């Protein structure tokens, strides 16, 4: 019993040091503890090893053991993907990387510049889109994001694109206007996937962002950026645990090819 407790304490400290959110650590440890304390030590395993085995199983249960693909409509039907997230998470670059990835898989993607607030957001998307050889639909910054999204959707249908990726505005922090705008876009066209782009370096903050977006707008998956930095991976675990949504890709660097599938 004492050995089990010591091992559990070590696991708990390791998770907290990895920047996993406190709430998630608490829930996770409860699940592990319930199994560890009630279980006879399996032959050939010492209590410490047994705890590690349980932790491993619980982690797999939480994160899933499969990679998750973006669900795309068949054939020439247009799949609409709305990118959401805070400013500085790397949303615009990630939108272009995702378009490039889908293009390399034989899709015909169209990027739409729906961020009319941040100076140079449209230009940034155009530059990144060009690098990927993907067309960027823009109506300048005088139209509403909803109108731009609708225009892009019509354009995608007419020109036989089968994926439309909407680059929406980020804010420095979550506000009602931002959420409302995303909801308005969702109401105006058939958004298939809302993908949240989160900066993994923000650790605990990333979790709050994911939770709020999930509650307000609803998200279908997450892309974690800046995973090549000094991040300890805790954000991935916390976001999955709290939002219940899969992590689709991780951004591992600046290059457009650095968007990698997430392998739990």
Region locations from a protein language model:
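Primarily NTPase-proximal linker/entry elements flanking Walker-type ATP/GTP-binding cores
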Residues: 1-114, 121-141, 148-168
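Conserved phosphate-handling catalytic cores of large alpha/beta enzymes
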Residues: 150, 161, 173, 180-187, ...
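Short, small-residue-enriched loops and turns at beta-alpha junctions
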Residues: 88-89, 117-119, 143-145, 170-174, ...
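Alpha-helical hydrophobic packing sites
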Residues: 21-23, 117, 169, 227-230, ...
